[in-house]
Regions:
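Bacterial N-terminal signal peptides
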Residues: 4-14
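The canonical Cys-X-X-Cys-His
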Residues: 27-42, 93, 97
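Flexible coil segments in periplasmic/lumen-exposed cytochrome c-class electron-transfer proteins
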Residues: 32, 82-121
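Extracytoplasmic/periplasmic, Sec-exported soluble proteins
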Residues: 22-23, 61-65, 85, 89
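Gly/Gly-Pro-rich "capping" loops immediately C-terminal to redox-active cysteine motifs
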Residues: 28, 42-78
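Electrostatic cytochrome c docking/interface patches
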Residues: 13-30, 81
């Protein structure tokens, strides 16, 4: 019985980390496919948007928390067709933006359950 419990706790510890990394990896891929043209690969500037979107003194801070950023992305991004990306993909790309900004760390998951508690400065 002790072995079974140990195995269960070990699996619980492993799979969330993998799932968290999967969300970040998905966000990175979505950003590369849908966001790079306008915002640039480094979030600093692209063909359509010349203002950096993450980092010190950038536009991302105006959203105050992760939920505000997600809601903006949900309604308006990508600019050429917000319906091109489903809700889980928008959570993933929002996580990617927040990790690049330093508001979240790799290994964390972003969802409606925790987004309002994650400040953006």
């Amino acid at each position: 019985m002790r072995y079974v419990l140990s195995l269960a706790f070990a699996l619980f510890a492993i799979f969330p980390a993998n799932a968290d990394q999967a969300q970040l990896d998905r966000g990175r891929a979505i950003y590369a496919e849908y966001c790079t043209l306008c915002h640039g690969a480094d979030g600093r500037r692209g063909q359509g948007f010349q203002t950096p979107i993450w980092g010190p003194q950038t536009q991302i801070a105006k959203f105050q928390n992760a939920l505000g950023l997600f809601e903006y992305n949900e309604v308006l991004m990508p600019f050429d067709g917000p319906d091109k990306i489903d809700e889980p993909a928008k959570w993933a790309v929002t996580l990617y933006l927040l990790v690049n900004h330093g508001a979240m760390q790799a290994g964390q998951t972003l969802s409606r359950a925790n987004a309002a508690t994650i400040p953006i400065r």
